[in-house]
Design a protein with these regions (language model features):
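Loop/helix patches that line or flank the sugar-binding groove of alpha-linked glycan CAZymes
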Residues: 2-7, 12-150
């Protein structure tokens, strides 16, 4: 990849697959969405496509990275949050308003990243239930298989 016409990074073809981290989504991708939605909220519940992607992620030779709550199918939004002083907090708010201005026609504005409630809403404990347990068991079984195969 390039930035400003200059190459970035280093060649990596000589590195083994386990030198790389593989994820389906992470805090940057989810937190930088205005709505903070995760893949589990963007796809139909129990989606075969999501289950297949998880299997590919966990059974590939790369190091799997699970995003917070992914292992139990969390559908809670994960919002961008900060704890900046007043001046920087205002600049971040203004920057995010500009960033999302063109795409916020039919949805609520993103929550204030510096509001402590935004942090609390992004870090919920999973609600109990059979669906959460089923996701957890799916991950557990794939990780057992991974340990056996790799």
């Amino acid at each position: 990849p390039t930035r400003g016409g200059r190459a970035r990074g280093e060649p990596s073809a000589h590195l083994p697959p386990w030198a790389f981290v593989l994820f389906l989504h992470n805090h940057d991708q989810v937190g930088n969405r205005a709505d903070g939605l995760r893949l589990t909220s963007l796809l139909a519940p129990g989606s075969p496509a999501l289950r297949a992607a998880i299997a590919l992620q966990l059974l590939a030779p790369h190091i799997p990275l699970l995003f917070m709550g992914e292992e139990y199918g969390s559908t809670a939004p994960f919002f961008y949050f900060t704890s900046h002083g007043p001046e920087l907090a205002a600049a971040v708010r203004a920057g995010r308003a500009r960033e999302f201005a063109a795409s916020m026609h039919d949805c609520d504005p993103p929550p204030d990243p510096n509001d402590p409630d935004t942090y609390r809403r992004s870090c919920p404990w999973p609600p109990p239930g059979a669906e959460r347990q089923a996701w957890f068991e799916y991950y557990r079984e794939l990780l057992r298989l991974r340990a056996h195969l790799l």
